[in-house]
Amino acid sequence: YSAQVACDKYGWALAYSVEAGNIHDSQAFPALFAKLEPLKPQFIIADSGYNIPSIAKFLIDKEITPVLPYTRPRGKKDLLRPKELIYDEHFDCVICPEHQALTYRTTTREGYREYKSDPAICANCPLLSVCTTSKNHQKVVTRHIWKDYLEQCEDIRHQRGMKELYQHR
C-alpha cells in the first residue's frame, strides 16, 4: 500500500489517503486534495511525483500556488536536451539548434502534441548524431497541452521565498 499525507508547516497531519501500492502519487492526489480543499490551502508543496501537467493546471486554476521541485530531464544523456529546442508559441512549432522548424502533426490521446522535423533536411544536419537515433532521420518532439502550467510552476519555484517554503515539505 501507499500512504499520502498532507501536513501543515508545523508537521501536523491535515489529511491522508491510503492507496494500493501500484498507484502513482499523481493518481492518488485527487482523493487527498478532496480532504484538503475545505481547509482552503494557499500553497501546495509536494515532491516530484506530483510535478505533472494535470496537477499543475488543477492547482493554478484553483488559484493555489504549487511549490514543486526541479526534475531532471529524462532521456538519453548523449542527445540534445529539451531546453536546446525552442517552442515558438506564435507559429506553434519547435525550433532546433540548426534553426529548422519541427511542425505540428497530431495530438495524442494523452494530451501530447507531436512536432516532427523534415527528414530530408535532417539527413544532412551536422547535429544529426546528437539529435535523433531514428532510422529515417526524423526528430519527434512532444509537448503536453498543459506544458505552460508546468512552466508557471518552474517560475514560481524561482520566486523569492519558495526555496525556503519547499524545505518545509
Label the predicted regions:
Residues 1-169:
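Anion-binding and metal-coordination hotspots
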